[in-house]
């Protein structure tokens, strides 16, 4: 199941172009982000590398070309921001419920 979600997120990320890319980044961050964060740490380290290593690993995994590797880094930035906002929202709501109960 995890593998399916991860591959689906990559596929939508590669196919999105133009106007759909803005809309897809938030949705893709939820779909693909959950898969990449749960995935192995080695996978993230490989994506963070810049140069032929990152591109070769991307083509081996089935990504189309270098542009998908470039959008992946932008996508990860949006993903981190989204998770941070979600974490802050969850913390605030938890604190509000806790103090309301007292």
From Swiss-Prot:
Glycans are attached at residue 65. Belongs to the HHV-5 UL15A protein family. Keywords: Glycoprotein, Host membrane, Membrane, Transmembrane, Transmembrane helix. Residues 1-79 are extracellular. The chain crosses the membrane at residues 80-97. Residues 98-102 are cytoplasmic. The lineage of its organism: Viruses, Duplodnaviria, Heunggongvirae, Peploviricota, Herviviricetes. Residues 1-21, 33-71 are annotated as: Disordered. It is found in: Host membrane. GO terms for cellular component: host cell membrane; membrane. This is Uncharacterized protein UL15A. Disulfide bonds: none annotated. The gene is UL15A. It is a single-pass membrane protein. Residues 56-71 have a biased composition (Polar residues). Its main location: host cell.
């Amino acid at each position: 199941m995890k593998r399916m979600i991860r591959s689906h997120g990559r596929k939508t990320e590669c196919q999105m172009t133009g106007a759909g890319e803005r809309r897809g980044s938030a949705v893709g961050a939820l779909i693909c982000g959950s898969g990449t964060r749960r995935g192995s740490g080695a996978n993230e380290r490989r994506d963070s590398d810049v140069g032929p290593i990152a591109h070769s690993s991307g083509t081996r995994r089935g990504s189309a070309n270098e542009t998908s590797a470039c959008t992946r880094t932008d996508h990860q930035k949006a993903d981190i921001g989204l998770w941070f906002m979600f974490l802050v929202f969850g913390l605030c709501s938890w604190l509000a419920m806790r103090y309301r109960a007292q």
